Amino acid sequence: MLDKEKKAEIINKFKLHETDTGSPEVQIALLTERINRLTEHLQVHKKDHHSRRGLLKMVGQRRALLNYLMKKDINRYRAIIEKLDLRK
């Protein structure tokens, strides 16, 4: 789980305007941070299958948001991919 400060920091970094908390970019950035933390957890706790299922659900949710953004605005999609270093 993300603490308030870390979540606010991510929102401030990726927001499009002053009151933005729910744009696809912000949602993708928050999901990426949660995915990274959960991945570290699963490397230590290999048999935690309940958390692994949650990880797969989050990855799918992020993938759906990325697909939406790619269809809606390819430039914003490319920017978020580069900023978060998601593709090789």
From Swiss-Prot:
Protein family (similarity comment): Belongs to the universal ribosomal protein uS15 family.
Assembly notes: Part of the 30S ribosomal subunit. Forms a bridge to the 50S subunit in the 70S ribosome, contacting the 23S rRNA.
Q: What is this protein called?
A: Small ribosomal subunit protein uS15
Q: Which Gene Ontology terms cover its molecular function?
A: rRNA binding; structural constituent of ribosome
Record keywords: Ribonucleoprotein, Ribosomal protein, RNA-binding, rRNA-binding
What's its job?
Answer: One of the primary rRNA binding proteins, it binds directly to 16S rRNA where it helps nucleate assembly of the platform of the 30S subunit by binding and bridging several RNA helices of the 16S rRNA. Forms an intersubunit bridge (bridge B4) with the 23S rRNA of the 50S subunit in the ribosome.
Q: Which domain of life is it from?
A: Bacteria
Any single biological process term in GO: translation
Which GO cellular component does the record give, naming just one?
Answer: cytosolic small ribosomal subunit
